[in-house]
Design a protein with these regions (language model features):
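Accessory beta-strand-rich segments of carbohydrate-active enzymes
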Residues: 1-107, 174, 213-214, 223-228
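Residue-level structural signal for beta-strand termini and adjacent loop
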Residues: 42-44, 147, 171-172, 271
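Active-site mouth of glycoside hydrolases
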Residues: 73-75, 88-90, 154-291
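Low-complexity, Pro/Ser/Thr- and charge-rich linker/hinge segments at domain boundaries
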Residues: 88-99, 106-113, 145-161
Length: 291
């Protein structure tokens, strides 16, 4: 059901006329209100939700209300057929976990940079303008050097990563977090979890019908563990079900854009034990490979 969370926020004077974004790292479908007026709604469940506050929200105090509903906002099949929602493991929790922030962003139009998929050169400089959320002034520019390449392919019966033949010894992760009832959101927690996996010789984790948060990828990048997120689905791909197909496609795009730059992000699946329209599945794969 729906739960309403509220807090009085204070917009600093030096944020005047600058774009302010509400960042919700992991939650359920939400509806955001400022001073009683609806800003927008969002149903992203695999990635952060971001709300650009209206320009009329001036510096000073305002009432921020967030309605979180774990019983509506996503296709019916997702509730009982994915570990993103299942009561069997992490539970169908209600709330907002991880980071909850008001961020001063640079340019709304230039929050990311892209390089052609599959193109690897010995040296590339990619300017990321506003790509990292910042509380700095709106005109600030971040320039980062990306000194790694990511290539993962098959030759014969073997996997190769950046030219090296590898063997994947993996485990299944169904979002089992019995002590909290929701996924771990800290890098420290994931370092412990993935570090334990490595102690047992495991170098690959498959996330059954769900996607872990940013902290998991950061920890895996550091430890050298390969991660395989999945769309939050376990069932039939039915091209006639436009609501389901639109939702899953958007979740896939979100996952790739949010986490696909991580070295540890090496594979992605459309869900668990799927059946149905094979051509529709191929269409999804073709679309995702272009990102």
């Amino acid at each position: 059901g729906a739960a309403r969370y509220s807090r009085t926020i204070n917009i600093p004077k030096d944020w005047k006329k600058k774009p302010v974004e509400l960042f919700l790292e992991r939650t359920r479908p939400t509806w955001v209100y400022v001073d009683g007026e609806l800003v927008d709604s969002c149903n992203f469940i695999s990635t952060p939700q971001r709300y650009l506050l209206p320009k009329k929200v001036k510096p000073g105090k305002h009432l921020l209300e967030i309605v979180v509903d774990n019983g509506r906002g996503v296709p019916e099949q997702v509730y009982g057929s994915s570990h993103a929602y299942t009561e069997d493991t992490q539970t169908n929790w209600n709330g907002i976990i991880g980071r909850i922030e008001l961020q001063l962003v640079g340019s709304v139009e230039s929050k990311s940079a892209e390089t052609p998929a599959g193109a690897i050169s010995s040296s590339s400089v990619v300017p990321l303008v506003g790509a990292i959320p910042s509380r700095s002034v709106a005109s600030s520019t971040a320039l980062q050097m990306l000194d790694f390449a990511k290539d993962f392919h098959i030759e014969g019966a073997h996997f190769y990563a950046n030219g090296h033949r590898i063997f994947l010894r993996g485990k299944h992760d169904a979002a089992v977090w019995p002590l909290t009832g929701h996924v771990e959101m800290s890098v420290e927690g994931w370092m412990k979890y993935l570090g334990t996996c490595k102690e047992y010789g495991i170098n690959h984790v498959r996330f059954h019908s769900w996607c872990p948060p940013e902290a998991a990828f950061l920890a895996a990048d550091s430890l050298g563990v390969y991660l395989q997120p999945e769309l939050p689905f376990w069932g039939s791909f039915d091209k006639k079900d436009e609501k389901l197909m639109t939702f899953l496609h958007q979740e896939g795009v979100n996952i790739l854009r949010e986490y696909g730059h991580h070295p540890s992000f090496h594979m992605m699946a459309l869900g668990n034990e799927l059946w149905g329209d094979i051509d529709k599945m191929k269409e999804f794969v073709d679309d995702f490979r272009k990102i």
